[in-house]
């Protein structure tokens, strides 16, 4: 594999060491000053684009250049980190270390002194800083006035920045709030602590003593940002590639379903809100779940927003900002000949695969155990017949194994040229997630209705013979079935970690097709999902230290 590394603009790579406010050309604190960011209309309009580019560019965090880290490609890389901390993404290779996310699978080096946990902190706060820059620049520009067309664009860009910032803080709150688990006790005085808030008004001095805020504070901040986003995005394009009302409503739904689960019980008002906003997206967006043809499309499957009607929000990846190895496709698509995936041989856990009935077309996301079926026409393969033969039989790389993943295709079905195959559209939210949020919320409000909604979704969109859960199912039964369907639906997409953590679900990597070194099991939610704050933050923020950090979970999970 060619290990070509691109050089990128300093505005994308020279960012932050965290929320720490070390003096830089643009402070990591609240935002850039007007001297640092041009007030021209062109500069203002382009600021939001620099943020989206930084979310997906190869080497965007500087970890590739500093440490040779080939998992440094922004949001898609973060989402793959989530997947490797769960149970269903199996590494099946004889040499499992082609899986470059192995530290997350192993639950090793997850403490504050390591880069593995630091990556989350650095990247989300980088994007928050960029959102703050946009907000700090747009607000005075709007106050100064402009012609009608420019004013509309300024407001829409401001709304996008608020939406992006809300998304960042929602992920951070869910990642860093410590939750009870069976392996690593949580000190009583850090329950419900999340992360420091940095907004457009935060100064460098503020950052030097900026504590973790409580759960209620961060979620109110998120809801306030979403309200502002909703206001400023009025009349904005409904394009999948930029925040719009449907994306904002989807973030509301994610936020409220999380708020429905409190440490000492449930909050029914929050479940009502979650159902309301998920329902708004379902009813008002005009979006529809993926069909079987779209799901299994060998050229466009999970890589092309315009090939389906399901995506609410996504990011288009440009070939100019990607290299062969630091990309989503090279780590998740077995059919891509240039990447790590075909050597790591990523697939579904056999335990998950065996739980899927043959009548559910989503089972076609992975090769079955019967090799005679592989060339029978049952499966659709990307590329040419030669590409198919190389993937199945091996040609300069290992041949496919049972349970190998087919879900994520190289762009345009291109299996050989990474410049083409890496330039995918990356999905951040699709309509199916809203159905599942509505189902979960409705169950808490009316169990019979929740079960029926799950049945309706499954029989209409996924498996018309579905009948796995009965009316009157208790919450434990419902939760298990709901999560199973989400595991099948969102495998590899970076959605599920938040479900597992919220629902207090264990992981079980005892399936025979997991690499031996990655086999482990938890009794409840994994302690690894209480992400540890990087020590780099301690060096500049006196309000955070070892005493109020999340406990280090490294090597505290049972190895099988």
Residue ranges and their predicted role:
Residues 95-176, 213-217, 228-236, 419-426, ...:
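Conserved, well-structured interaction surfaces
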Residues 21-81, 331-347, 352-358, 362-367, ...:
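Membrane-proximal, proline-rich intrinsically disordered regions
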Residues 32-38, 70-77, 176-191, 235, ...:
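Short, surface-exposed recognition loops and adjoining beta-strand edges that mediate ligand/DNA contacts
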Residues 128-131, 219, 226, 271, ...:
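Inward-facing hydrophobic residues that define packing positions of alpha-helical scaffold repeats
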């Amino acid at each position: 594999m060619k290990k070509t590394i691109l050089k990128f603009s300093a505005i994308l790579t020279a960012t932050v060491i965290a929320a720490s406010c070390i003096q830089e050309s643009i402070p990591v604190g609240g935002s850039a000053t007007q001297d640092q960011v041009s007030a021209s209309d062109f500069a203002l309009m382009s600021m939001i684009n620099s943020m989206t580019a930084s979310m997906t560019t190869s080497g965007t965090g500087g970890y590739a250049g500093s440490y040779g880290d080939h998992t440094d490609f922004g949001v898609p890389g973060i989402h793959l980190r989530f997947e490797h901390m769960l149970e269903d993404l199996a590494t099946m290779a004889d040499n499992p270390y082609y899986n470059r996310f192995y530290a997350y699978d192993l639950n090793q080096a997850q403490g504050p002194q390591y880069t593995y946990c630091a990556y989350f902190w650095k990247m989300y706060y980088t994007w928050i800083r960029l959102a703050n820059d946009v907000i700090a620049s747009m607000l005075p520009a709007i106050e100064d006035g402009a012609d009608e067309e420019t004013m509309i664009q300024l407001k829409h860009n401001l709304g996008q920045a608020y939406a992006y910032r809300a998304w960042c803080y929602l992920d951070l709150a869910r990642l860093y709030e410590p939750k009870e688990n069976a392996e690593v006790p949580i000190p009583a005085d850090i329950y419900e602590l999340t992360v420091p808030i940095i907004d457009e008004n935060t100064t460098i001095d503020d950052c030097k003593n900026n504590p973790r805020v409580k759960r209620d504070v961060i979620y109110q901040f998120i809801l306030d940002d979403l309200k502002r986003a909703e206001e400023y995005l009025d009349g904005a394009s409904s394009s999948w590639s930029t925040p719009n009302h449907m994306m904002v409503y989807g973030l509301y739904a994610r936020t409220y379903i999380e708020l429905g689960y409190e440490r000492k019980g449930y909050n029914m008002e929050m479940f009502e809100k979650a159902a309301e906003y998920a329902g708004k997206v379902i009813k008002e967006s005009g979006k529809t779940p993926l069909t079987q043809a779209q799901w299994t499309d060998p050229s466009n499957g999970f890589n092309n927003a315009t090939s389906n009607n399901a995506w609410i929000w996504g990011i288009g990846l440009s070939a100019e900002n990607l290299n062969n190895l630091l990309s989503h496709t090279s780590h998740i698509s077995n059919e891509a000949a240039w990447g790590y995936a075909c050597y790591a041989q990523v697939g579904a856990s056999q335990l998950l695969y065996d739980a899927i009935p043959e009548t559910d077309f989503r089972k076609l996301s992975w090769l079955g155990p019967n090799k005679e079926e592989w060339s029978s026409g049952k499966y659709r393969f990307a590329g040419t017949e030669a590409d198919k033969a190389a993937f199945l039989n091996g040609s300069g790389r290992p041949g496919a194994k049972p349970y190998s993943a087919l879900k994520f295709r190289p762009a345009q079905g291109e299996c050989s040229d990474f410049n083409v195959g890496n330039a995918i559209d990356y999905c951040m939210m699709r309509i199916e997630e809203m159905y599942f949020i509505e189902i979960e919320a409705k169950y808490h409000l009316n169990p019979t209705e929740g079960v029926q909604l799950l049945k309706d979704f499954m029989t209409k969109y996924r498996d018309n013979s579905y009948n796995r859960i009965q009316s009157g199912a208790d919450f434990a039964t419902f939760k298990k079935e709901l999560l199973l369907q989400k595991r099948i639906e969102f495998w590899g997409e970076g959605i599920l970690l938040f479900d597992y953590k919220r629902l207090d679900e264990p992981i079980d990597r005892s399936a025979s097709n997991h690499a031996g070194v990655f086999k482990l099991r938890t009794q409840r939610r994994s302690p690894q999902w209480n992400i540890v704050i990087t020590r780099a933050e301690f060096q500049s923020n006196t309000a955070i230290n070892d005493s109020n950090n999340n406990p280090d979970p490294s090597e505290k999970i049972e190895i099988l």
